[in-house]
Amino acid sequence: MEFYGTIGPACAQPETLQRMVEAGMTGIRMNLSHGPLSAHKDWLDIIHAVGIPQLLIDLQGPELRIGTLPQPLVLEPGQSLRLGQGGVPCPAALVHAARPGQNLLLDDGRLLVQVAGADGAALQCTVVRGGTLQSRKSLAAPGLAVASPTLTEADLQNLQLAGACGVTGVMLPFVRGAEDIRALRRALEQAGAGQIRIFAKIENLAGVQALPEFLPLVDEVVIARGDLGNAMPLWELPRCQKQLSAVCRSAGVPFMVVTQMLDSMCSRAVPTRAEVSDIYNAVSDGASRVMLTGETAAGQYPVEAMEYLVRTARTALE
């Protein structure tokens, strides 16, 4: 069983990471949607100094995100929001593809806006579910196919550095089919890093449907419930997770379950009963890896969260 945290300001100190390792953490994830590998030398130095054996980098891939904001935006229901030129930066491909009536989910679905109009340069939206929007948060358009490359230019640059930085695995978001995996494999080999393992993230319906097709090409599967939960009604997500788990288990391919495993521990020292039950069930369904994201990257209790993750998963294995 492997246990991963995500590095961020809340845990990027040698003492904190060491305590997380002592709690049972075996690997760390670095989210490159917030900055390139070359900008994180300080984090890499700490990771290697502590001796964390597994280092995963999470690429941007075909994922949609907003750009950098000068300051967080507080959005209220009914308020207008401009996405694109002259407003909140967002991918041009989305601006060109979205039509009035399209729902857009921000920050793993915490915020919801609806497209009211488009002028070719931006989308004029109305806030349906408000909240605070911060830089580089995820953006999803349920039911809309947005043309985007498997790997961005930034991804290719990060892959060139991956081997020298001690990366052991690459997480590819929003896998849509076998060609996405082949493209990543080619890029790794061209970078002289063909030994690095590929973790395919299932985050949309295309990935769910194509899983049997690309399963033989990957080293591990990641059931990433944040954006996957944006692609369907939330009440269908548990069934989808169990179905994906069964497919991976039958094929003998290791899989990981991630996103909001202990979300309440971003601000509370003790998890909810539902959260520990969720971890237990994921492991009982065959997950051989579980991961924390915001809980360790930005939460108030990164060490305690790792302790609960490890202890609950190990109890499920008894």
Regions found by a protein language model. Give the residues of each.
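Non-catalytic helical/linker scaffolds that mediate oligomerization, partner binding
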Residues: 1-318
